[in-house]
């Protein structure tokens, strides 16, 4: 810090020298792609059943904490639904210009279950699976598909993000939909779907998948200085998850919404 105060190194360089819990490390895009734990369940994201109780859409290393959490919660509104695809992020956080940080995907039976079961077998359901699979692997180019899948893809999420982003989209009428949605990605604090968020895990433990998300944000903060962050939910939880150097490097780039503007998602 003395070098920083003396003006011999920049504030950013000073932050770079702070250590996190495991010591300072640089997270590269190559490392993220190689160590992406979601690759291990990529095979589940094929077929046509976007609601499938015969599948468990969860990382093996996350299951103990999730199963323990679900078994200890009497109120099923808090249970994580593993019969629908997990979504740690939507869009491509490695290429987006604005990263939306939220809490976890919401569950609504008429959307996540009923609409999923009504999707025609074939191109639509398989195409949506492909979009979600490619998103898991950082291989999509936008926040949502810009083709005939658009309507059904959004209905599965109760059109939530389409509605919220429409206010911004209307402000830039000169930008076509494809270009607009390429600028956004959503990263969830927890990848698993629930009707209501039921709190953290026992002993304040983090899921292994959350620790990978932590590394993902570290990469974005230090390798993508142009990226802005919009924290819609769980501000304090994100602050606790991220290392101090990452959080304080993010602060000037955080866009703050109005209080409770997006509280119900």
Regions found by a protein language model. Give the residues of each.
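Glycine/proline-rich loop-helix segments at beta-alpha junctions forming the active-site rim
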Residues: 1-29, 169-265
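Short linear motifs at secondary-structure transitions and domain/linker junctions
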Residues: 72-78, 160-162, 204-206, 242
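Active-site and ligand/interface coordination hotspots across diverse enzymes
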Residues: 1-150, 216-220
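Low-complexity, serine/threonine/proline-enriched polar segments
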Residues: 118-191
């Amino acid at each position: 810090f003395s070098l920083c105060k003396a003006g011999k190194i920049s504030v950013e360089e000073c932050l770079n020298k702070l250590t996190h819990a495991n010591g300072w490390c640089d997270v590269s895009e190559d490392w993220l792609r190689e160590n992406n734990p979601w690759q291990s369940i990529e095979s589940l994201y094929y077929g046509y059943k976007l609601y499938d109780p015969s599948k468990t859409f969860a990382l093996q290393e996350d299951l103990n904490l999730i199963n323990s959490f679900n078994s200890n919660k009497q109120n099923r509104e808090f249970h994580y639904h593993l019969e629908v695809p997990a979504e740690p992020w939507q869009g491509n956080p490695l290429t987006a210009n604005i990263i939306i940080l939220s809490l976890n995907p919401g569950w609504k039976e008429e959307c996540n279950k009923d609409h999923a079961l009504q999707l025609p077998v074939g191109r639509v359901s398989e195409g949506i699976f492909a979009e979600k699979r490619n998103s898991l692997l950082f291989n999509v180019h936008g926040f949502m598909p810009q083709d005939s899948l658009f309507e059904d893809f959004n209905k599965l999420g109760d059109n939530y993000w389409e509605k919220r982003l429409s206010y911004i989209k209307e402000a830039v009428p000169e930008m076509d939909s494809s270009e607009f949605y390429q600028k956004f990605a959503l990263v969830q604090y927890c990848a698993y779907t629930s009707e209501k968020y039921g709190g953290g895990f026992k002993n304040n433990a983090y899921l292994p998948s959350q620790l990978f998300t932590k590394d993902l944000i570290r990469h974005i903060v230090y390798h993508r200085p142009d990226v802005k962050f919009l924290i819609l939910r769980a501000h304090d939880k994100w602050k606790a998850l991220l290392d101090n150097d990452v959080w304080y490097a993010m602060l000037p780039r955080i866009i703050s919404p109005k209080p409770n503007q997006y509280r119900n998602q």
